[in-house]
């Protein structure tokens, strides 16, 4: 596997005010301390569990990563209580004839990725304590979806993070190869709609394609959080995808190309702006995109897809 070089200021380090001479062990402890501080605050301030829509479910996908890192059962139990509150479901309609996948927040939008991201957490909880009821609805929904002749389910960038890892997680649990075939088919559609091969970045959705839509300075407008969703999705997919999968190299190549493009957009202070190629479009940090990029890039450094270096900025990858 070819290795690419990344030189990136990690946003979490910048925010935490770490000393440049701190040891790796001290830096790691400080990061874990920040995770505890933030996550404990969130959970104590939000004891009542909300719906299984993306706004809560995206948090729980991160909370489970915090559990895997720390081993703190309180984190896991918080997500488990949320899953139980939502009956281990996303949207709750049982009438398949009314299931939809355009934008909507009612219970008939079962096939909409905003209501499928919760399945990531359910699969993680299943792997910790196997119980078929935890993934019964996830399997029902995804296997129905895969039985249709549609391939345009992922029409916005967010959807790649929301559902791609669901399919690799369920493949690992079930061994059903259709999950990986449909994963690639749906991703190919999303690519054809949103990916810009010249800049190796994704538009938020079809409404933002250049030159139909432009930034304030007439440039291509790539949304930081949207591309953050995608880079993190690719990292999570590669984490679970079999080494023998016939499409694995495609995902690796795309991940590396995006990592190079993302690193080139980083601001000197360590953050990313909302419009990646036009910082003046919305000046200042876009924190959600910065967090996603930090996760996605660090995953590559920690798992042999990217190699950290202190080379000059124009040689970051």
Question: What name fits each language-model region?
Answer:
Residues 231, 236-276:
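Oxyanion-binding "anion nests"
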Residues 151-205:
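Aromatic- and glycine-enriched pocket-lining scaffold segments that form the walls
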Residues 58-73, 117-131, 163-176, 229-247, ...:
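Well-ordered alpha-helical scaffold segments within catalytic/enzyme domains
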Residues 23-98, 128-140, 177:
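Low-complexity, Ser/Thr/Pro/Gly-enriched N-terminal "stalk/linker" regions
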Residues 1-26:
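Bacterial Sec-dependent N-terminal signal peptides
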Residues 308-317:
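Single conserved hydrophobic/aromatic residue that forms the stacking wall/gate
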Residues 40-43, 60-68, 96-125, 158-170, ...:
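Carbohydrate-binding/catalytic loop surfaces
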Residues 135-161:
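Asp-box/WD-like beta-propeller blade repeats and closely related beta-sheet repeat scaffolds
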